[in-house]
From Swiss-Prot:
<keyword id="KW-0131">Cell cycle</keyword>
<comment type="function">
    <text>Could be involved in septation.</text>
</comment>
<dbReference type="InterPro" id="IPR007170">
    <property type="entry name" value="SpoVG"/>
</dbReference>
<dbReference type="Pfam" id="PF04026">
    <property type="entry name" value="SpoVG"/>
</dbReference>
<dbReference type="GO" id="GO:0030435">
    <property type="term" value="P:sporulation resulting in formation of a cellular spore"/>
</dbReference>
<dbReference type="InterPro" id="IPR036751">
    <property type="entry name" value="SpoVG_sf"/>
</dbReference>
<dbReference type="GO" id="GO:0000917">
    <property type="term" value="P:division septum assembly"/>
</dbReference>
<comment type="similarity">
    <text>Belongs to the SpoVG family.</text>
</comment>
<protein>
    <recommendedName>
        <fullName>Putative septation protein SpoVG</fullName>
    </recommendedName>
</protein>
<keyword id="KW-0717">Septation</keyword>
<keyword id="KW-0132">Cell division</keyword>
């Protein structure tokens, strides 16, 4: 499965303490689209959060997620590459 498109929707944070940097939509093989991946700045660096839902007991469960580390790295790399391309001076890439 190949990533054929990555679209970044930056979040303009007026509050500098906000951790959310962007929402991402990824297209696979021009036939499957995954919406609402989030780019988050945490204490240890920047990472992606897959689309999730809050359960009745308050836990968050991923709706969809990579099942192995190598694909997660491919996905994260494609997202960060596009983010940096669109925001070269606004992003210090320190991955978690």
């Amino acid at each position: 499965m190949n990533i054929t498109n990555v679209r970044i929707r930056r979040v303009d944070n007026k509050d500098s303490s906000s951790k959310l940097l962007a929402y991402v939509t990824v297209t696979f093989d021009d036939c499957l689209v995954l919406h609402n991946i989030r780019v988050i700045r945490g204490q240890k660096g920047v990472f992606i959060v897959m689309p999730n839902r809050r359960t009745k007991i308050g836990e968050y469960k991923d709706i969809v997620h990579p099942i192995n580390q190598s694909f997660r790295e491919i996905l994260q790399s494609a997202i960060f590459k596009e983010y940096v391309k669109e925001n070269p001076s606004n992003f210090e890439l320190e991955l978690v």
